[in-house]
Amino acid sequence: MDCVTSHNPVATFRCEVKMKPGKILFLLLLTGSVWSLISHPGKTQEAPSPTQLNTQSPAPNAQELTQVTGVRVVPTVQGLEVILDSTAAEKLQVSTQNQGNSLIADITNAQLNLSEGNTFSQNNPATGVTNVTVVNHNDNTIRVTVTGEKSLPKFELFDSDTGLILAFTATEVAQDSPAEVDEPIELVVTATRTETPIQNVPRSITVIDREQIAAQASTSRNLIEILGKTVPGLAPPAQGASNFGLTLRGRNPQVLIDGVPQSTTRNASRDLRTIDAAAIERIEVVRGPSAIYGDGATGGVINIITRRPTEEKLTSRTEVGVSAALGNLEGDSFSTNLQHFISAKQGNFDFTFNFAVAKNGGFFDAQGDRIPSDPNAQGGFADASSINLFGKFGIDIDANQRLQLTFNRFDEKQDTDIASDPRVNTIPGRQKARALEGLSLDERPGNENTFINLQYTHDDLFNSKLQAQLYYRDYLTRFFPFDGRSFASLGNEIFQSRVESEKYGGRLQIETPLFNQGAAKLLWGVDYSQEDTSQPVSVFDQAAFVASGGLAFRKTGDRSWTPPLELRSLGLFAQLNWEISDRFVFNGGVRYENADVSVNDFRTLANPNVTIGGGDLNFNATLFNVGAVYALNPQLSVFANYAQGFSLSDIGLALRNAPPGFSVESLNPEPQKVDNYEIGIRGQWDTVQASLSAFYNESDLGTTFTAPGTVIRAPERIYGLEAAIDAQPSSTWQVGGTFTLIGGEIDSNNDGDYESLDGFRIPPLKLTAYVENETLPGWRNRLQALYSGNREVFGNNNTAFGRRPVESYLTVDYISSIKLGAGTLQLGLENLFNSQYFPVVSQLQANDSAYAAARGRTLSIKYSFDW
C-alpha cells in the first residue's frame, strides 16, 4: 500500500502526517501521584488511530503468536527497510501511530524472539533517520519505532517469502523525489485541546509560526503590534503596553501561555506584556467566543505556545539588534536587544533555554517630536528595560510517557523622566499629547510575570490518552500615576495603582476512542484554579504635583482601591470529535463552571473612612458548543458552529466603586454569557490558501467599560465579516492580506432601543496586505501595509471617552533578510513613508494628554547566527 486511509475531511488519503509542537497540558495531582502512573504504565492494546494500516489477513487467534526470529535494517535510496524475519509474515497485522517525529508500527499477535535478547536498536541507520528500535511492546505485540531527524518518516508495507518488510522514507529525502508528495497536515491544539488538523475544526483560526514572529519582530517586538498586524478580527494595534481596546470580534480575548491563564480577576489589560517574543514558538488564535479553557474567552482565545526542543543534539543561536528613529537619528531613540537560544537532546532527555534582554530608548513621531512614555494613559514601554528567562526541561519516560517542566520570568521596568504634559488639556481644540521632561517618580511603571508549568502525558493509559498539568503564576503590574482630582468616585486623588495576583491551578483531560476505529473520540476532564488578587494605590501630594507642572509625585500614603479577593473556579467538560466520513466531521461539547469569590471587609478610595462589609459570592454557568465541517472536495470545505463563551464580570472594578451601605452579597454579579453563531468556507490549494467567515454573537449582560471606571451591564450584539488569503504565484513570490469589518450595538437602557458600541469595543474597518519576494537566493524582501478606516457613529463633535470620531490612516513597513557570513542579517523599516498618524486607541481618548501620535519611520537592524 502506498497511502494510509484517513478521516481527514478534505482529503481521502494522506501519506504524511506532521506533528507540530504544543501538547495540551495536564493536572497531575488530581489523579494521584505521577510516579504511580510511571511505574504502572498501561499495557492494554492501543486503540486504532485514524492513520491505522492493516495487512491483508484477518487477525489470527491471540494464542497463535507468530515468532519473529531476526531483525535487519537495510538502507535504501529513499530511506531504509526494516525486515522482520518470520515464516508466517502473511499473518502479521500492523497498525501505525505518530508521536512527534517518530512513526510507531505495532505488530499484533507476534513476539520478538531473537538469539541475542529481545531488543533491537540502531542509531543513524540512514540519512534523515536518527534511530530504529524494535521491542516487545507487551506479551503479544511487537513495536517498531522509527524516528526522523527533522520530520515524520513515511511508511509502506510489503510481504516477502522470508518475512515482513516495513519501508520507511525520510521526509526530507522524499521531498527531492520527482514523485508528488502531500503537504504536511497543520495541527492546532487551542480550538479542541487536542492535536487536530486545522481543516477539521469548525472555527476560524489563525496560526502565527516562529518564522512569522521573527519577521514581525524586525519592526516591533511588542506582541500587541505583531498580533494586530496579522490576525483578522483583531482591532488595529496600539503602540503601548496595554491591550485595552485590542478586542477580538468586539470582545475581550482570553490569553494563555501553554494553557496557563494570563488574565487577572481585576482586569489589568496587560495580558500580552507577560513574555518576550523570543520565547515563543507559535501563537494560535481561535476567533469567536469559547468556553473550552474556562472564563474570559468571550472574544476568542490567544494561546501562546513556547519554544520547543529541537531534534538536534545541540542547537545554539544568538541574536543582537539595534533600532532608532530615522527622523533625526535622535540619540535618545536608540534601542538595543540581545537574545540567546540553546536546545539540546541526549537520549530521552531534552532541554530548551532562552535569554532575552532589551533596552528601549525614547519613541518619536513622524514630526520628530518625542512621544510621552505613557502615550494613552494605559501604560507604555518607551525607555523601558526588560529581561526574559525561559527554560523547558523534558524527559521521555518511555514511548508513551513524557514529563515536562516549563519556567518563564518576564521583568520590565520603565525608567523614564518623560511625562505627558497635562497643560495640553486646557488648550482649545484637539491637541497632540506633548512630552514633558523632569518626571520625579520613585516606583516606576512595569510588569513582572513568573509562571511554572508542569506537564505530563501518557499516550496509552487503558486505551486512552491522558494529559495533565499543574501551574503556578505570580504577577505584578504597576501603572503610571493618574490625575483623578476631577473624579469624586476616585476620591479626587492623584494616585498610582498596581495589580497584584497569585494564581495556581491545574488541568486534567482524557481522550478516549469510542468507535469506528477511533474516528469518534471523547475528550473529558476537569480544570481548577485559585487566584488571590488586590489593587492597592499610592497617593501623592497634590500641591507638589501642581507646583511642578505635573512632574513631581511625592508619596503621602497607601490606600486600598480594589480590596483583596480570592476566586476559586472549578470546570467540568466533555467534548466529542467524530469524523463521520472522509468528508464530514462533527464536534460538540458541554462545560459546567462553578466559581466562588471571598472578600473581607474593605474601604474604598472614594470613602476611606467607611467600612464596607465583605462576604462570599457564588456563580455558575453551563456552556454548550456544536459545529461541523463538510468537505466539498479535497481542497474546499465549509463549516458552521454555535458556541458559548462566558466571562465573570470584573468584580474588582465593581467593588472599588462600592457606595456606603453596600455589601458584597448585594452585588451578586452574573457571568456574561455570549451566544455565537458562525459560518465559513476554507480553501487549501497548492498555491492559494483562503478563508471567509461571517459571525453574529449576543449577550444579555455586557461588560462595557466607561470612564472613570464603571461597567455597563446591558444587552449587546456584535456581527462581522472576516477574510484572509495567501498566495504563492511562483517559488519566489508570496502575496496575501486580511479583511475585518465589525459592527456592534448595546441596549444601555434595556428598553429594546440599541445604539452603537463605543470605539474601544468596535474597531473601524481593517485591511492588511503584504508582498514578499526572494530577490536572490538567501535574500528576501517584504512590504506590508495596514489600513484602518474611519468611524463616526456618535457625531463629529462628540468628545466623550471612546466616542470620539476616528480618522483613517495607512502605514507601510519594509522587512528584509539576507544570509550574511555565518548568520542572517535582518532589516526592518517601520512606517516606511514616515506618516504622521494616531492609532485608534489614541483617537478615542477624552483627554488630549492621552492623544499620542504613532512612531515615525524607525529603523531596526539585527544579526543572528548559530554556533
From Swiss-Prot:
Induction: Expression is transiently highly up-regulated by iron starvation. GO terms for cellular component: cell outer membrane. Pfam families: AMIN, Plug, TonB_dep_Rec_b-barrel. Coiled coil: none annotated. It is found in: Cell outer membrane. GO terms for molecular function: siderophore uptake transmembrane transporter activity; siderophore-iron transmembrane transporter activity; signaling receptor activity. It comes from the Bacteria. The keyword Secreted does not apply. It is a multi-pass membrane protein. Keywords: Cell outer membrane, Ion transport, Iron, Iron transport, Membrane, TonB box, Transmembrane, Transmembrane beta strand, Transport. The keyword Ion transport applies. Disruption phenotype: Viable. Significantly decreased growth rate in liquid BG11 medium, but grows similarly to wild-type in iron- or copper-deficient BG11 medium. In iron- and copper-deficient BG medium, shows a much more pronounced retardation of growth compared to wild-type. Significantly decreased growth on media supplemented with ferric chloride, but grows similarly to wild-type on media supplemented with non-toxic concentrations of iron ammonium citrate (FeACi). Shows reduced chlorophyll fluorescence in BG11 medium similarly to wild-type in iron- and copper-deficient BG11 medium. A motif (TonB box) lies at residues 185-192. Its main location: membrane. Residues 40-62 are annotated as: Disordered. Involved in the TonB-dependent uptake of iron in complex with schizokinen, a dihydroxamate-type siderophore. This is Schizokinen transporter SchT. It comes from Nostoc sp. (strain PCC 7120 / SAG 25.82 / UTEX 2576).
